Amino acid sequence: MGLSDGEWQLVLNVWGKVEADLAGHGQDVLIRLFKGHPETLEKFDKFKHLKTEADMKASEDLKKHGNTVLTALGAILKKKGHHDAELKPLAQSHATKHKIPIKYLEFISEAIIHVLHSRHPAEFGADAQGAMNKALELFRKDIAAKYKELGFHG
């Protein structure tokens, strides 16, 4: 399940592109998530009123939250699988406060892959996509284990 050094390098190379515009990438990821899986929008009280893509693109709050999401994910990815300290508070809030099902983390992972591929096709070919998929799968597996420890079976 772990990634090789080369795979982590592919993940971190494309992540460098993401960090140049975390808010923009994050906004695109959330829009993709909400359009592809409208049920996920119900978990976000402050975004429920955003019904169209135009509304979502105009929302500074959505952009800020996208920045927050990708900043947290970047910190986790940079740990190359040694992310327990970063994962613990994230799992705690997502399991107990927000009650975000693991399935929704799969949905946002798909959105991340799509956005990275559409925004960075040269840097995000098949090998990089495969590596990022593995990294996101590792993240989901580990957060699911934390959810279980917390008694949340979402």
Curated annotation (Swiss-Prot):
Pfam families reported for this sequence: Globin
Reaction(s) this enzyme catalyzes, per UniProt: Fe(III)-heme b-[protein] + nitric oxide + H2O = Fe(II)-heme b-[protein] + nitrite + 2 H(+); H2O2 + AH2 = A + 2 H2O
InterPro entries (UniProt xref): Globin (IPR000971), Globin-like_sf (IPR009050), Myoglobin (IPR002335)
CDD domains reported for this sequence: Mb (cd08926)
Residues annotated with Phosphothreonine modification: T68
GO molecular function: heme binding; metal ion binding; nitrite reductase activity; oxygen binding; oxygen carrier activity; peroxidase activity
Subcellular location: Cytoplasm, Sarcoplasm
Domain (Globin) ranges: 2-148
Protein's name in the database: Myoglobin
Organism encoding this protein: Tursiops truncatus
